Amino acid sequence: MSPTTRRLGRLFGLLAAASIVVTACGAASAPALTDPKEIVTAAVRTGQSAKSVHVDATLDGSIKADLSGTGAAGAAISLTGTTAAADIDLTAGNAHATFAVPALLGLSGEAIQIGDTTYFKTSLTGDKFQSQKGSDSLPVNPGDSKSVVDSINEALSQPGVDPVKGDDVACGSTQCYTVKIELTPSEINALDGGNPLASQLPVDLGSASLNLTIRVEKSTTRLAGIAATVAMGDQGSVTFDLTFSKWDEAVSISAPPADQVQTGS
């Protein structure tokens, strides 16, 4: 995987890390913030006691992927209408997610993470879950907020990463700050020291630009959403939107029954 791909993944990963340490806070409204970096880091700092969260995702656009490995982009693959939803138990480190990609042969699937075990099935693999042992699903310890804040601050201090406070917007029944980050292909490549390598992915991210908008509730400074557009020139573009809700509501996530898990995998 190229450094450019890793940097994009790291940026998204850090923002995702921020999302899982943000909590619903019942205290009085926070003072108004004007600095975009303070808005993002404030959202992280409110997350020291988060117990659970629900995430909804939508994905639209199309890409031309080199699925044959020949180096030539293939036909456009539509991602329009793709959706996903997840409940995350931050205390136990468990998660339950579902997804659907209607434009890709009606693909759908379900994943359950219990500790270091992942159970996964799709409409192409049959009715039973396959299980796999691995590392814990959550990329950070929700209680280690200082580490996450430091990582976010480091990411926001990189050359070319210049967050800008946008207009406040409605978020359901409340108001949200918006923080915008725009990165050109050259700025993304500069994050890798200007030495991008050939990507091992079927899509070359070396020419990708990124437009990112982070939504943070004004009254609680908790993360409300992340929207991003990744433009890849002739290879297409993808837009996704994540919304976060049901903070600290009761959630029960358990492994599937044994008779629903494929044996010998």
Residue ranges of model-derived segments:
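Sec-dependent signal peptide hydrophobic core
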Residues: 9-19
